[in-house]
Amino acid sequence: MAETCKMKYSVLDSPLGKMELSGCERGLHGIRLLSGKTPNTDPTEAPATPEVLGGPEGVPEPLVQCTAWLEAYFREPAATEGLPLPALHHPVFQQDSFTRQVLWKLLKVVKFGETVSYQQLAALAGNPKAARAVGGAMRSNPVPILIPCHRVVRSDGAIGHYSGGGQAVKEWLLAHEGIPTGQPASKGLGLTGTWLKSSFESTSSEPSGRN
């Protein structure tokens, strides 16, 4: 019988509003935007410094690591490349599924300053024809920003919707990382060769961008 997780919570005041982090001793379970601000999409304006508003005593190490990672991200996104990632223990990461495979590929392959299309991410996850399933995986992402579903865009460059806080939040995150919007996805252009390009061109079943 699986052991029930003893959940703990903490709150971070970020440039996007208050964010709730949830997790147990074994890993992070979720990142949730509690109250949205109207993000300033001007990338030349420095974001407000994030502030930890507190939580229960004895915050598990995965929440401590996630807080440190998010604080660094909101100060300077590139600085997160050298930081440890918290262990992840949401049920979606405990199941052998295409959703888990997509989320892991997105986390490990699509780095700061890059974007990827639904079709490209489907190919990276092993099924080039599963672009619509990738859209479903983005909606199921329990840890947005950490697993960067905001970097997943349509093939034509349209950014689409964003279940992690809405289109304005997605635009802010892309601008914060210095990623231009309205341009084709940048991932794969020399990463995996011509097989990716041919796979993308042979599939047309791309979701409407509601992730």
Swiss-Prot record:
What does the UniProt keyword field contain?
DNA damage, DNA repair, DNA-binding, Metal-binding, Methyltransferase, Nucleus, Phosphoprotein, Transferase, Zinc
Positions annotated to bind Zn(2+): C5, C24, H29, H89
- Amino-acid positions noted as binding DNA in the UniProt annotation, renumbered to this chain: T99, Y118, Q119, N127, R132, S155
Main subcellular location of this protein, as a coarse class: nucleus
Q: Where in the cell is it found?
A: Nucleus
Q: Would you name any one GO CC term?
A: nucleoplasm
GO biological process terms, alphabetically, are: DNA alkylation repair; DNA damage response; DNA repair; methylation; negative regulation of apoptotic process; positive regulation of double-strand break repair
A molecular function (GO) term = metal ion binding
**Phosphoserine modified-residue sites:** S14, S205
Q: Where is this region: Disordered?
A: 35-57
Q: What is its EC number?
A: 2.1.1.63
Active site positions, chain numbering: C149 (nucleophile)
Reaction catalysed by this chain?
A: a 6-O-methyl-2'-deoxyguanosine in DNA + L-cysteinyl-[protein] = S-methyl-L-cysteinyl-[protein] + a 2'-deoxyguanosine in DNA; a 4-O-methyl-thymidine in DNA + L-cysteinyl-[protein] = a thymidine in DNA + S-methyl-L-cysteinyl-[protein]
Pfam families cross-referenced by the UniProt entry: DNA_binding_1, Methyltransf_1N
Q: Which NCBIfam families match?
A: ogt (TIGR00589)
The remark listed among the other comments is: This enzyme catalyzes only one turnover and therefore is not strictly catalytic. According to one definition, an enzyme is a biocatalyst that acts repeatedly and over many reaction cycles.
Which family, according to the similarity comment? Answer: Belongs to the MGMT family.
Q: Identify this protein by name.
A: Methylated-DNA--protein-cysteine methyltransferase
Q: Which organism is it from?
A: Mus musculus (Mouse)
